[in-house]
Amino acid sequence: MVATLTRALGSRHLTVAEDAVQDALLTAMQQWPFRGVPEHPEAWLFQVARNRALDRLRHGKMAADKEPALARESATVALPSAAPLLREEWPAVEDDELGLLFLTCHPALPADARVALALKLAGGFSVGEIARAFLSQESTIAQRLVRAKRQLRDEHVSFGTPAPHELGERLDSVIDALYLMFNEGYAATAGDQLVRDEVAFEAIRLAGMLAAHPATVCPRVWALLALMLLHAARFPARIDSEGTLFLLRDQDRRMWDRATIAEGLRALDRAAAGETVTALHLEAGIAACHAAAPSWDATDWPQIVELYDELLALTHSPVVAVNRAVAVSRIDGPLAGLAALDAIENASALERYPLLPAIQAELWREAGDLERAAACYRAALGLARSSPEHRWLTSRLSLLV
């Protein structure tokens, strides 16, 4: 409903649309328990939201301009129903939903604002839920959302799917925002929870929406979806009921969601249809190698190193180089892995990255130098950002001292 109202009102009245829908839902909560649910609840909600929007605009003397557009929407409104998270054929998406996603992920907005706005408007998250997901104060998130909406209004950003000549750049912005959203769900940057399923699954839903629409479906969207699904399949094995972290090496692979893996592999097959190999394709390929391996030791490490080599050549990312070093250590031993870590270019960018000393600690432990391993574990503890990471590092250090 927010998307449909925003299309009718224009993106500069995004807040009006959002408030009108909230008013309609509140009215339903107050009336339906006593008067019963109307025969067509979606149409009823839209009509109430439409009237609330007009009331708000009348105060600004703009209702007359918008009433014809709202009337057209009232006559044709057909809101999408909820769909399963994962399925072989992704549900069709309404153009209004897609337009709202492009609006929230406009490249003019800062990356953190795109993710927050997408969760709020395209995902339906409350300010409180977003604040909890990112361990921020509600006031901080509320201010971020207000600034983002003001920027969209001031820059006269239009609502809807971009024109063909600008679709590529705009789609990249949406993909980047969803990638960040999923990463925050997969490994939260701070707090008591490492995995925030609700954020990761919302990123998957929105990526599936892109894959289901003819205007946005393309190989890199399928690659994004494949990457998300293949990682999400391991969620049940990453954290136990007490919040204990299990690295990939130590996970019980019987707990992996095989249906989600199959869905991810199908998405990866569809991603292969294009001629361009992107970083998303390579990351999804690495995730597929892990998903296919019966055990840590039986993983196709040479193939993974090859994929990391391609990814490193494409991105020049020091984080990619760290992950590549782990794969090298599985083939040539811990000292080779440590040498690969020492050879990383732009290593200064990793000064606050806890995974680097944690990996060094593991490799020194495997090499038999427990003193160096303990020192690296302590360094990693000083950088750990979440409680599960801190507990895991503490437990590893306790085995050495």
Where are these predicted regions, by residue range?
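Short, charged helix-capping/linker segments at alpha-helix termini
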Residues: 2-21, 31-39, 138-139, 189-194, ...
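Amphipathic helix-loop-helix modules that constitute alpha-helical solenoid scaffolds
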Residues: 60, 68-129, 136-309
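Σ70-family region 2.3-2.4 aromatic/basic alpha-helix that recognizes the −10 promoter
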Residues: 22-28, 39-68, 149
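"A position-specific structural signal for the A-helix of alpha-solenoid helical repeats
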Residues: 224, 228-231, 283, 287, ...
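Residue-level preference for hydrophobic side chains embedded in well-ordered alpha helices
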Residues: 1, 20, 24, 44-49, ...
